[in-house]
Amino acid sequence: MQEPHDQEPIEKQKLPGMDDVLETEHSGTVAGNTERAGEDAAPSLEQQLKEAEIRAAEHHDAWLRAKAETENIRKRAQTDIASAHKYAIDNFSVQLLAVMDSLDAALATENSTLENLRDGVELTRKQLAAVFEKFNIHTIDPQGEKFDPHQHEAMCAVESDFAPNTVIQVMQKGYMLHDRVIRPAMVTVSKAKGT
């Protein structure tokens, strides 16, 4: 008989075949835990995928709406620009109607004298000048000024006592709209004698 102190406690004793049983239990537990963990993780990934697909669809829908809105704004802007070009002189045209009315009234007058016709033409010219001023149309009348190719068109050059390249005669006045020449003044320019 063995003494009680010589015996190993039962828990620490190795029994034959115990290693195999412990190993099987341990690997089964680990495998079971892994399967359960995989089952728990899989729905989470599927759920995340569904949520991502929903968000992607929402973003795609918002993008399509923004694209359509941008296209509508572009078309509206093109229409507005075309309309602005088409009717740009609308207000100017209305102002010119008063000038036309004055000319019609002058022509409708019977037995008018030359003096009355002249007065009527002067009045009509003043009306037209007022319309031009209102719309920033300015006259280019360069008599005696230095020739400027940006505002004047030289029809001919004549020997003169004036300094070379001086406008000595205005054949037709020019006009500017704001700071843009809409018609250059047609002029005769001086040139040095003997050239």
From Swiss-Prot:
Principal location: cytoplasm
Stored CDD domains: GrpE
One GO cellular component term noted in the UniProt record for this chain: cytosol
Record note on quaternary structure: Homodimer.
Known function: Participates actively in the response to hyperosmotic and heat shock by preventing the aggregation of stress-denatured proteins, in association with DnaK and GrpE. It is the nucleotide exchange factor for DnaK and may function as a thermosensor. Unfolded proteins bind initially to DnaJ; upon interaction with the DnaJ-bound protein, DnaK hydrolyzes its bound ATP, resulting in the formation of a stable complex. GrpE releases ADP from DnaK; ATP binding to DnaK triggers the release of the substrate protein, thus completing the reaction cycle.
Record protein name field: Protein GrpE
InterPro entries assigned to the protein according to its UniProt record, in alphabetical order: GrpE, GrpE_coiled_coil, GrpE_head
Region entry Disordered, spans: 1-45
Top-level taxonomic group: Bacteria
